[in-house]
């Protein structure tokens, strides 16, 4: 074996072997237990970042470990390759999105191979290819036929100057990113999939996901937002019109003092006809940012409509206001306002001098609403026949009254809205719907699929090429002239079923059910927690759609989910002459002074600018603190980068990038290499004879097999890869100090190194691949099994016993593992320190904790 550890040479050689032998290509095998490990596939942005490397290293470690368990392991990879960044890059670089995307895929594919990830490249998919999205289009038409797809108007960001729709990220401070025109909200027709029909199942089936993080399940429960309440009807005074309101707090209904409706509510638009102030306010509301964050932060404002509503129980009239905090696309677009028992309503009522009437108080006291609303549940008062009732009794009584009078009904509602899948972008899968000359909208016939997105286009930065290309939109269906839909799918569509396509990526159908049902569900899914409420919900929803279409036979797409933490790095900046922050790459920073905890106090860049250190933050382009994986691999090798990624922190926590720790990982691999080299240099080894081992050898072998057991448990059950590595490092320290004088010393070292190489193989596979053969083993390490724990090695011949007198340590003794209490007591009492502290005293009691402690009570 070569003496020096040369990662670039070793890794190139091993990767070539994997490629030549197609090591990681797999097929279905009914005789082997399958294991499907999947990391969320990347967007081909151009270069891998350290977040990618962490995600994919975790997945590769799990996959390689499971392979050594003898399982048939599938680990595929592909590209989530549609999306807005490609359009922006195409505009910037005067090219089309397609070539930019395919070039990035080629580059990033080489980076993934360079890191040694064991993917089945024969299953590679790119979502921007017709071979992939044709089946998405086909499935959409089937959902339409089942009544799960519909079209309705929905609000979008609209630039009136360019006459184009903007994505949320293209709206900067309320203006168009391109021309700085104030952005408006515009209602346009869009396609929706009825995810709400699956809301109850999506909620209930979270209970099946025992191996998903509780945080993700809680976020999904809140996003789905199931609530039980009453939908009640309010009549408009002096009119035959009425409107519905849903509330989860019917116990407060007797305290309604006004009603708030959305700017888009029919009553608001009707009232605005002769009310210029209201009309102006409605326009202002229509152009407001309606994201949750913006709604929470904005000032709550309103304008009275001049209309009154009739309370469904008291018959009293209450004013109807238009409020900017009520959304037409949420609930019924109207809310009952009880300022005494809702803080938002309270502040609004105070602002506009509206009545505040308390109707709920604590069960054991009075209610004080002089400073704020009382929002807890309690006992009703000032509520006529409902006085004295608690929340549930009031809920039931008010429900019964409203139901009997035909003014309301108990109802389950969900916060979840139907999934709007239309995007007014170019670089996405065309939605397979056509409009006939008579205005009828139908799905594109199956024999005309896929509807291919033209790739040879020019991006003008204003309008989608397929919207401006009138010829592309023209088609013929059943001999009739028709026009294609020019919207494209939300890219969450592609990422909602890719995991299933991997099972049969070349099938001339959406899925081959036999193959899909062999591999699915995914056994281990890995990705960031930021995907909890969007991708991971659509992912689950799509699986149920596939199930109900007879394509899969399981309820959920993934058994186990690991959400890895972010990768952080130091961030530095200086203010330029205009006062703007200029972020400086860590590689361009010289630290001049640190505090006693090693934190930067003073630093400069290569041009001498004094820098402000902002601490560790997520690696990002905006803070220029990303570390290029390519540079690290070139400098230290892929195995070092992988080892650092798995050792620096538990997988679900943030990882702080420290190059000194990367150097430490590199030193450890070199130490492993040297230990193996030195052992091999001593020549052939004899067979290990466990019965002839001396006490020191037995102890070393015990540590070896304890480590094998712990590492397996840490990787498989606990997923604490960092502690698994730490255990192997501790064992290596013991091995380096172990004697190599006798044949059994060498035989024991051979057993230990054979085990260590397999324990570390999932993490540093290139190094371990070579060492496995250098140690004299036949065949590739991928084809061997994880080391077995020899239970007999764990049995201890002796035990260390702590001896105390009156609770204080006085001696430590070593006794036979099977020594009786009497034997331990005799040995303990004979110890010099015990004799000294019991002399002249009476032993009152002897307490023995078997195998651990002897406590002598004497006075």
UniProtKB/Swiss-Prot annotation:
Entry-linked InterPro entries: aa-tRNA-synth_I_CS, aa-tRNA-synth_Ia, Leu-tRNA-ligase, Leu_tRNA-synth_edit, M/V/L/I-tRNA-synth_anticd-bd, Methionyl/Leucyl_tRNA_Synth, Rossmann-like_a/b/a_fold, tRNAsynth_Ia_anticodon-bd
Reaction catalyzed: tRNA(Leu) + L-leucine + ATP = L-leucyl-tRNA(Leu) + AMP + diphosphate
Task: Report keywords, A-Z.
Answer: Aminoacyl-tRNA synthetase, ATP-binding, Cytoplasm, Ligase, Nucleotide-binding, Protein biosynthesis
Binding of ATP, residues: 621
SUPFAM superfamilies associated with the record: Anticodon-binding domain of a subclass of class I aminoacyl-tRNA synthetases, Nucleotidylyl transferase, ValRS/IleRS/LeuRS editing domain
GO biological process terms on file: leucyl-tRNA aminoacylation
One GO term describing the cellular component: cytosol
Pfam families reported in the protein's UniProt record: Anticodon_1, tRNA-synt_1, tRNA-synt_1_2, tRNA-synt_1g
EC number(s) per UniProt?
Answer: 6.1.1.4
Q: What is this protein called?
A: Leucine--tRNA ligase
Q: What is the organism field in this record?
A: Shewanella halifaxensis (strain HAW-EB4)
Source taxonomy lineage?
A: Bacteria, Pseudomonadati, Pseudomonadota, Gammaproteobacteria, Alteromonadales
Q: Which gene encodes it?
A: leuS
């Amino acid at each position: 074996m070569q003496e020096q550890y040369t990662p670039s040479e070793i890794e190139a050689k091993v990767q070539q072997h994997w490629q030549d032998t197609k090591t990681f290509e797999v097929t279905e095998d009914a005789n082997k237990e399958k294991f499907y490990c999947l990391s969320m596939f990347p967007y081909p942005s151009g270069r891998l970042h350290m977040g990618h490397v962490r995600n994919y290293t975790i997945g590769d470690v799990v996959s390689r470990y499971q392979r050594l368990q003898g399982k048939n392991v599938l680990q595929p990879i592909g590209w989530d390759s549609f999306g807005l960044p490609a359009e922006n890059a195409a505009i910037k670089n005067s090219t089309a999105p397609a070539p930019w995307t395919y070039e990035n895929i080629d580059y990033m594919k080489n980076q993934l191979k360079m890191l040694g990830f064991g993917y089945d490249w024969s299953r590679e998919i790119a979502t921007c290819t017709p071979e992939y999205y044709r089946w998405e289009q086909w499935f959409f038409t089937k959902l339409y036929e089942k009544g799960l797809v519909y079209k309705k108007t929905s609000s979008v960001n609209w630039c009136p100057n360019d006459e184009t729709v903007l994505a949320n990220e293209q709206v900067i401070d309320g203006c168009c990113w391109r021309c700085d025109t104030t952005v408006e909200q515009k209602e346009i027709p869009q396609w929706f999939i009825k995810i709400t029909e699956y809301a109850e199942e999506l909620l209930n089936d979270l209970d099946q996901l025992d191996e998903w993080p509780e945080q993700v399940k809680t976020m999904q429960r809140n996003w789905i937002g199931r609530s039980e309440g009453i939908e009640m009807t309010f009549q408009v005074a002096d009119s035959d019109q009425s409107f519905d309101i849903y509330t989860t707090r019917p116990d407060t209904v007797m305290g309604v003092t006004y009603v708030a409706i959305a700017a888009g509510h029919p009553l608001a638009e009707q009232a605005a006809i002769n009310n210029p102030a209201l009309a102006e306010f409605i326009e202002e509301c229509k152009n407001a940012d309606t994201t949750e964050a913006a709604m929470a932060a904005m000032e709550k404002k309103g304008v009275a409509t001049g209309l009154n509503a009739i309370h469904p129980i008291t018959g009293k009239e209450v004013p109807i206001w238009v409020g900017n905090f009520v959304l037409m696309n949420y609930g019924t677009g109207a809310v009952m306002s009880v300022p005494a028992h809702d803080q938002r309503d309270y502040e609004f009522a105070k602002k506009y001098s509206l009545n505040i009437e308390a109707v709920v108080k604590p069960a054991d006291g009075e209610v004080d609403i002089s400073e704020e609303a009382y929002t807890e549940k309690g006992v009703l008062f000032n509520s006529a026949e409902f006085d004295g009732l608690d929340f549930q009794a009031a809920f039931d009584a008010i429900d019964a009254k409203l139901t009997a009078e035909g003014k309301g009904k108990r109802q389950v509602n969900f916060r979840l809205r139907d999934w709007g899948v239309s995007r007014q972008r170019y670089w996405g899968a065309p939605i397979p719907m056509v409009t006939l000359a008579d205005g009828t909208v139908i799905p594109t016939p199956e024999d005309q699929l896929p509807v291919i997105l033209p790739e040879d286009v020019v991006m003008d930065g204003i309008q989608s090429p397929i919207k401006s290309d009138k010829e592309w939109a023209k088609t013929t269906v059943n001999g009739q002239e028709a026009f294609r839909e020019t919207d494209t799918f939300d890219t969450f569509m592609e990422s909602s079923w890719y995991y299933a396509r991997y099972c049969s990526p070349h099938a001339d159908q959406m899925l081959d059910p036999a193959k899909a049902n062999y591999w699915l569900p995914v056994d281990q899914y890995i990705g960031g927690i930021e995907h909890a409420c969007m991708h991971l919900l659509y992912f689950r929803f799509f699986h149920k759609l596939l199930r109900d279409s007879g394509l899969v036979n399981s309820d959920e797409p993934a058994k186990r989910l690991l959400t890895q933490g972010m990768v952080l790095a130091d961030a530095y900046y200086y203010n330029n002459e205009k006062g703007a922050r200029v972020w400086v790459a860590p590689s361009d920073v010289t630290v001049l002074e640190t505090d006693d905890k090693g934190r930067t106090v003073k630093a400069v860049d290569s041009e001498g600018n004094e820098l402000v250190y902002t601490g560790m933050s997520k690696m990002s382009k905006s803070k220029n603190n990303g570390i290029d994986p390519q540079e690290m691999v070139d400098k230290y090798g892929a195995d070092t980068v992988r080892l650092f990624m798995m050792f620096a922190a538990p997988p679900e926590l943030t990882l702080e990038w420290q190059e000194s720790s990367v150097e430490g990982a590199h030193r450890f691999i070199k130490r492993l290499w040297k230990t193996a080299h030195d052992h091999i240099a001593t020549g052939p080894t004899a067979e290990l004879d466990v019965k002839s081992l001396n006490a020191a050898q037995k102890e070393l072998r015990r540590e070896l097999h304890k480590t094998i057991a712990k590492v397996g448990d840490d990787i498989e059950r606990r997923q604490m890869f960092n502690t698994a590595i730490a255990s192997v490092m501790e064992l290596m320290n013991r091995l380096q100090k172990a004697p190599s004088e006798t044949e059994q010393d060498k035989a024991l070292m051979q057993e230990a190194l054979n085990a260590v190489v397999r324990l570390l193989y999932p993490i540093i596979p290139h190094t371990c691949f070579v060492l496995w053969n250098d140690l004299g083993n036949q065949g590739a390490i991928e084809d061997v099994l994880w080391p077995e724990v020899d239970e007999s090695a764990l049995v201890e011949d002796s035990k260390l016993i702590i001896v105390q007198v009156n609770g204080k340590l006085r001696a430590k003794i070593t006794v036979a593992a099977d020594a009786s209490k009497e034997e331990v007591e005799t040995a303990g009492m004979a110890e010099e320190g015990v004799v000294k502290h019991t002399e002249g005293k009476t032993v009152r009691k002897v307490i023995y904790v078997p195998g651990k402690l002897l406590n002598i009570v004497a006075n």
